[in-house]
Amino acid sequence: MKLIEFGSRHSFYEWFRRCDRSDNYPLINFNYIHCWEEDTHIYRCVEKGKDVGVIFISCCYPGEMWIDLFEVKKGKHRTGIGTKMFRLLMEKHTPLYVKLECVEEEDKEKEAHHFWRKMGFHKTYDRTVLGDAFVKTYTKKYWKNYDKL
């Protein structure tokens, strides 16, 4: 498996528009408010010539990484791909702290939360976000001290 970094956000969006990928990931509205483009990194995760995942990170502060998107292709969950992706990411970036928000979606959150706990993350706080009048989304933020990997 290898991580292929997009040269810019523009090339990432062009890749989505061209459909030059083996899976149709949803185009997510990333939060760029606090980061310059040079502080963000977007990776395609490729195994045997096929896309198996996408990672989007922000490194706005020294020694800190924020995982904005960490997605394994549908149908590839629980096969070890996410663990490989995370280890490759940590080889490329060696932050002191890694932060992320893990959204709860009914039964799906159990799988995602289990994965991040397995990677050594710990819950640091909860907060409630109201989408529209009908939807409540719960998020959890995790941190990890890289020295304990």
Where are these regions (language model features)?
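Conserved active-site alpha-helix within GNAT-family acetyltransferase domains
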Residues: 104-126
